[in-house]
């Protein structure tokens, strides 16, 4: 009998810890130790995309989950953007650098907060990083869904 985890969650105390922990989690996901993209028998799960969920914010602390979601998740998030519960950010890179896309997206969120363009709700935020081979334009993309007031 095979199984698949929907998510794995860790509590993060700092940005430095976050980066180190994420590398370890991704290594465990890609090698199948944490069956999110693969089931427990190492079979790839078609139609499942990895995303980050940021929640339970408290000063510099937060919970970070890596989740495997189906396309319906993104449809629901787009509806929440239209309803005004989330602001969507989309940053891309022609060289396929997903880390750079993510960095640029988070820098824009910070700038928008400082300028007053958005007021974050700090409820639950999502990040999806997509490699160029899975996008229509052949660029790496970072999509952020930031909860707003």
Where do the language-model regions lie?
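A solvent-exposed interaction/effector surface
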Residues: 1-149
């Amino acid at each position: 009998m095979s199984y698949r985890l929907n998510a794995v969650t860790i509590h993060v105390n700092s940005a430095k810890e976050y980066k180190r922990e994420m590398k370890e989690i991704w290594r465990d996901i890609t090698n199948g130790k944490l069956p999110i993209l693969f089931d427990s028998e190492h079979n790839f799960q078609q139609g499942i995309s990895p995303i980050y969920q940021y929640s339970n914010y408290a000063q510099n602390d937060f919970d970070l989950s890596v989740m495997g979601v189906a396309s319906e998740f993104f449809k629901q998030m787009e509806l929440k953007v239209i309803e005004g519960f989330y602001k969507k950010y989309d940053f891309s890179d022609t060289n396929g650098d997903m880390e750079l896309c993510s960095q640029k997206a988070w820098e824009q969120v910070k700038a928008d907060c400082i300028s007053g363009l958005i007021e974050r709700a700090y409820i639950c935020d999502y990040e999806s990083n997509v490699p160029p081979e899975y996008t229509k334009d052949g660029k790496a993309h970072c999509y952020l869904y930031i909860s707003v007031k």
